[in-house]
């Protein structure tokens, strides 16, 4: 019961994983220290893959965690939450990630296309979940925000690194004139 008190009241995820059809990691983002070392993370990922890759279900309970998953051609997508997390919210995150990638990759959600567009994957995951807290579940909004990152974004919506990069570009162009 104490764990419930310590957890935030917002919907959260513990990890988002994408594995290939051999169970090898293509993308992994852990939001807490349930598995603090890379060795423990990879062992957990192999365990998940071995339990889920032969079944058609969408949810599993493993090591006290709720795992929702989906496969596409040669990829396996996983969203992991605590055992008391709302499974529908975890599935909403999974569907949002998959649908966002499907739109970004023009419905070609497979390993090669994903590896060629990893920056889009990182941006999409950051738009959907921040620090484990679910921010967005609408794939249209995610795709729109990811597309904005490549265009001129208003100064109020930019990160510090984006502002510095923009300032460097402006200074460079003013010196070249």
UniProtKB/Swiss-Prot annotation:
GO cellular component: COPI vesicle coat; cytosol; endoplasmic reticulum membrane; Golgi membrane; transport vesicle
Keyword Metal-binding: no
GO terms under biological process: intra-Golgi vesicle-mediated transport; intracellular protein transport; retrograde vesicle-mediated transport, Golgi to endoplasmic reticulum
Annotated InterPro entries: AP_mu_sigma_su, Clathrin_sm-chain_CS, Coatomer_zeta, Longin-like_dom_sf
Subcellular location: Cytoplasm; Golgi apparatus membrane; Cytoplasmic vesicle, COPI-coated vesicle membrane
Residues bearing PTM N-acetylmethionine: 1
Main location: cytoplasm
Keyword 4Fe-4S among record annotations: no
Protein topology in the membrane: Peripheral membrane protein
Entry similarity comment: Belongs to the adaptor complexes small subunit family.
Protein task: The coatomer is a cytosolic protein complex that binds to dilysine motifs and reversibly associates with Golgi non-clathrin-coated vesicles, which further mediate biosynthetic protein transport from the ER, via the Golgi up to the trans Golgi network. Coatomer complex is required for budding from Golgi membranes, and is essential for the retrograde Golgi-to-ER transport of dilysine-tagged proteins. The zeta subunit may be involved in regulating the coat assembly and, hence, the rate of biosynthetic protein transport due to its association-dissociation properties with the coatomer complex.
The protein, known as: Coatomer subunit zeta-1
């Amino acid at each position: 019961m104490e764990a419930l008190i310590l957890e935030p009241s917002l919907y959260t995820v513990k990890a988002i994983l994408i594995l290939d059809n051999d169970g090898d990691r293509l993308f992994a983002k852990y939001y807490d220290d349930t598995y603090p070392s890379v060795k423990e993370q990879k062992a957990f990922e192999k365990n998940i893959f071995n339990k889920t890759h032969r079944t058609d279900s969408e949810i599993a309970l493993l090591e006290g965690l709720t795992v929702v998953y989906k496969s596409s051609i040669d990829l396996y997508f996983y969203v992991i939450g605590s055992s008391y997390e709302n499974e529908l919210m975890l599935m909403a995150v999974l569907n949002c990630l998959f649908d966002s990638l499907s739109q970004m990759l023009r419905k070609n959600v497979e390993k090669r296309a994903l590896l060629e567009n990893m920056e889009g994957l990182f941006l999409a995951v950051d738009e959907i979940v921040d620090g484990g807290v679910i921010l967005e579940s609408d794939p249209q909004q995610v795709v729109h925000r990811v597309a904005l990152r490549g265009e001129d974004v208003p100064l109020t919506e930019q990160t510090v690194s984006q502002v510095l990069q923009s300032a460097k570009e402006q200074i460079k162009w003013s010196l070249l004139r």
